[in-house]
UniProtKB/Swiss-Prot annotation:
This is Histidinol-phosphate aminotransferase. Pathway: Amino-acid biosynthesis; L-histidine biosynthesis; L-histidine from 5-phospho-alpha-D-ribose 1-diphosphate: step 7/9. GO terms for biological process: L-histidine biosynthetic process. The modification N6-(pyridoxal phosphate)lysine is found at residue 231. SUPFAM superfamilies: PLP-dependent transferases. NCBIfam families: hisC (TIGR01141). Its cofactor is pyridoxal 5'-phosphate. Its EC number is 2.6.1.9. It catalyses: L-histidinol phosphate + 2-oxoglutarate = 3-(imidazol-4-yl)-2-oxopropyl phosphate + L-glutamate.
């Protein structure tokens, strides 16, 4: 038999791991620091680590009860109803659920360029078409504006807004998000990806739902918000994310989710991580320091960032990333994002960040 036509589909390529690079170069993994995948260098929440150990003996059971526990904890955190929280196997799983709930074959979505490849991948998996809007660099850096989105809008069923945006670090304000929703059709979903939301002081778009303190904005039923445990909570390896949706979608989750959408271990870890504010605060404080340090000390143009990373214009991203790799520092060459002059530097520990800046200054100067 033949597969369906996959010619329009692209491969998602994650940043390479330390072990893979070490094998390639014939060196010891301990020689490298990985600042290429926006992971939490401080590791998982200590409370989550304990919960993972305790959950291990229960993995022969399906996660129905603990799934409900996590859903309730998230609903309490955001002051929404349990039915408004769609727990998933990573943020990408939540994207798939939202695509299933909104897209008919032939519908189109509007995604940022550059941006997260999986937005378009998920739409195409669900027989949708993909259009793009530009995240352009202006005199003051990269900006996220409603005008840029709406100028490219042509009635798409879903519009994806990433805030803070990867890889630029720029953000949408709530006013700009509302402007996009106001200026698109009432049947268009504005999907706000807040995977890096813990690292910005901008209020979450969850505050735009009915019953929330939206700062003077009318409540919306055409916005959904994506969140993840991969970044600030340090749980990227267990794959846990969720969407927060309008209360009018109450019965849709059961119709679009996979059976037991997240594992016992993931759900237990998520519940524990939500109760570990000290870990999140230490992480975000470290990121704030690291962003300032890179902006101040890196001898290349950097851009204001509201994520756990900084984008830098180094002239030839491929050459610089390769040279840094040979010096033991892995950063993200952003050529694949359409930014061949830029690298993205994840904020590491203090020593990792200082080492990365020193190496990049050296290789950029050669």
């Amino acid at each position: 038999m033949e597969l369906r036509d996959l010619s329009d589909h692209v491969e998602y390529r994650a940043g390479r791991g330390i072990e893979e690079v070490a094998r390639e170069l014939g060196r010891d993994p301990s020689e490298f620091v990985k600042l290429s995948s926006n992971e939490n260098p401080h590791g998982p929440s200590p409370k989550a680590t304990i919960a993972i150990r305790e959950a291990a003996t229960g993995v022969h059971r399906y996660p129905k009860a603990v799934h409900a526990d996590l859903t309730g904890a998230l609903a309490d955190r955001w002051d929404v109803g349990d039915d408004q929280v769609w727990v998933a196997n990573g943020g990408d799983g939540a994207l798939d659920y939202l695509a299933r709930a909104t897209l008919d074959p032939g519908d189109s979505v509007l995604v940022p360029s550059p941006g997260f490849t999986y937005y378009g991948m998920s739409a195409r998996f669900h027989h949708g078409n993909v259009a793009e809007y530009d995240v352009a660099e202006g005199a003051d850096g990269f900006e996220m504006t409603a005008d840029a989105v709406v100028d490219a809008y042509d009635g798409e069923r879903v519009v994806y807004l990433t805030t803070p945006h990867n890889p630029t670090g720029a953000r949408f304000t709530l006013d700009e998000i509302v402007a996009v929703a106001d200026r698109t059709d009432e049947d268009t979903l504005v999907l706000v990806d807040e995977a890096y939301g813990e690292f910005t002081e901008t209020p979450s778009a969850v505050t735009l739902f009915d019953g929330q303190p939206a700062g003077g904005h009318a409540p919306r039923d055409d916005i959904a918000v994506l969140r993840t445990f991969s970044k600030a909570y340090g749980l990227a390896g267990i794959r846990l994310g969720y969407a927060v949706v309008p209360d009018s979608w109450a019965d849709a989750y059961a119709r679009v989710q996979t059976p037991f959408a997240a594992s016992v271990i993931a759900c237990q870890a998520g519940v524990a991580a939500l109760d570990d504010d000290d870990h999140v605060e230490a992480t975000t404080d470290s990121v704030a320091w690291g962003r300032d340090y890179i902006h101040d000390e890196l001898a290349a143009r950097t851009y204001e960032s509201h994520g756990n990373f900084v984008l830098a214009n180094v002239g030839d991203a491929g050459r610089v990333a390769e040279a840094a790799k040979r010096e033991g520092v892995l950063v993200r060459d952003c050529t694949s994002f359409g930014l061949p002059e830029h690298v993205r530097i994840t904020i590491g520990t203090r020593s990792e960040t200082e080492r990365a800046v020193a190496v990049l200054n050296e290789v950029c100067d050669t």
